[in-house]
């Protein structure tokens, strides 16, 4: 008879844990530890939105098993500055098998995590790098401060009049 209450409590505890784990991915499940308060898109949806809105894309490529990726997640998610700057980008979060096979998404190698910036047309802009990082791994960011600096550089280069003028020159 004592087994029944324990079994019920164990089932309730298991269900609660399952609910906690599944709800930690947020309403759209795209945060993956990088912040459910950020409006994440898939790459396909992000490219469409960027083309329609004129906003650049910020793409994070990471793996669920990667130690450096796991270390970056809380720093990224807890940064109010990243959260604020994210409103000026279409944010894309690619994990594991979601990583694109296109070589443009690994301009200097397939290491992880990588953060790339794309212009509103969906073209990877390899000139936007982590200026304060390892020169052998130009798209590897280890701190929120480095990410913020990259976002500010991308915003400066890929939005506003400067980008439009440069983009028009390229088309002519």
UniProtKB/Swiss-Prot annotation:
Top-rank taxon, per record: Eukaryota
Residue positions of motif Prevents secretion from ER: 169-172
Catalysed reaction, written as an equation: [protein]-disulfide + 2 glutathione = [protein]-dithiol + glutathione disulfide
Places the protein is found: Endoplasmic reticulum lumen
Enzyme Commission number: 1.8.4.2
GO BP annotations listed: negative regulation of endoplasmic reticulum stress-induced intrinsic apoptotic signaling pathway
Any coiled-coil regions, as ranges: none
CDD domains: ERp19
Secretion signal, residue range per the UniProt entry: 1-26
Entry-linked InterPro entries: AGR/TXD (IPR051099), ERp19 (IPR037462), Thioredoxin-like_sf (IPR036249), Thioredoxin_CS (IPR017937), Thioredoxin_domain (IPR013766)
GO molecular function: protein-disulfide reductase (glutathione) activity
Main localisation: endoplasmic reticulum
GO cellular component: endoplasmic reticulum; endoplasmic reticulum lumen
The UniProt record lists the keyword Disulfide bond: yes
Keywords: Disulfide bond, Endoplasmic reticulum, Oxidoreductase, Redox-active center, Signal
Summary of the function given for this chain in its UniProt record: Protein-disulfide reductase of the endoplasmic reticulum that promotes disulfide bond formation in client proteins through its thiol-disulfide oxidase activity.
Name of the protein in question: Thioredoxin domain-containing protein 12
Species: Bos taurus
């Amino acid at each position: 008879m004592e087994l029944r209450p324990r079994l019920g409590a164990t089932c309730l505890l298991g269900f609660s844990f399952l609910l906690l784990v599944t709800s930690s991915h947020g309403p759209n499940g795209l945060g993956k530890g990088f912040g459910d308060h950020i409006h994440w898109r898939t790459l396909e949806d992000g490219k469409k939105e960027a083309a329609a809105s004129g906003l650049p894309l910020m793409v994070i490529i990471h793996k669920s098993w990667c130690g450096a990726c796991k270390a970056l997640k809380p720093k990224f998610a807890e940064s109010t500055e990243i959260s604020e700057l994210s409103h000026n980008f279409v944010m894309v979060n690619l994990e594991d098998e979601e990583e694109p096979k296109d070589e443009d998404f690994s301009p200097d190698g397939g290491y992880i995590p990588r953060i790339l910036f794309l212009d509103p047309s969906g073209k990877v802009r390899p000139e936007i790098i982590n200026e304060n990082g390892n020169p052998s791994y130009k798209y590897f960011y280890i701190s929120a401060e480095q990410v913020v600096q990259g976002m500010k550089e991308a915003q400066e280069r890929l939005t506003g009049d400067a980008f439009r003028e440069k983009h028009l020159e390229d088309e002519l």
